[in-house]
Design a protein with these regions (language model features):
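Glycan-recognition and catalytic cores of secretory/periplasmic carbohydrate-active enzymes
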Residues: 1-174
Length: 174
């Protein structure tokens, strides 16, 4: 399993997409980038692990570049949460709050938990990810419902009143 994964990751690193970061399902090139927050669970831990296994700095360099591009677009510094993707940057919930998906932010926290297990302790970028993990964890903790769950909408629990078990699972895992 390692060799096909490594071969694909090497191809991606050697042929980085110059597609836009704004998600548009009609444009294939936007799916080549980490244009939705869920991708921060799917890809970065793999690139960190490949760096650890091979020592090839291209993997961690690529991961840092793509992660920060996603962070720059989707992380709201005021709310300290990630938008699901660029389509949500201007949308609001019924209560007027910005839309931040519980599951999406859970994906990010889960990805950070996985990455930080292997991320080199002396790497200059480690502090960015540690700080982000703490920031996002503290914010998520404040948004937990009294019943112990999180909701699909982190700032408008009434919009989806049922508990969001996948968000809760990811956040608790992290």
């Amino acid at each position: 399993m390692l060799y096909p994964t490594q071969a694909r990751a090497e191809w991606v690193v050697n042929h980085p997409s110059d597609g836009p970061m704004e998600l548009d399902y009609k444009k294939r090139e936007t799916l080549e980038r980490w244009t939705w927050c869920d991708a921060l669970y799917m890809a970065p831990p793999v690139y960190v692990k490949l760096y650890v296994l091979t020592g090839d700095k291209r993997f961690i360099k690529f991961m840092n570049k793509e992660y920060k591009a996603t962070y720059d677009l989707l992380f709201d510094k005021d709310e300290r949460l990630f938008y699901r993707d660029s389509r949500y940057l201007t949308q609001k919930e019924a209560n007027g709050a910005k839309i931040f998906w519980g599951r999406g932010n859970g994906w990010v926290l889960g990805g950070l938990a996985e990455m930080l297990q292997d991320f080199p302790k002396k790497d200059k970028n480690r502090k960015f990810y540690e700080d982000l993990f703490v920031t996002l964890s503290e914010r998520a903790a404040k948004l937990q419902s009294p019943d112990g769950f999180w909701h699909a909408s982190m700032l408008d629990p009434a919009s989806y009143p049922s508990p969001e078990t996948s968000a809760t699972g990811f956040i608790v895992y992290a």
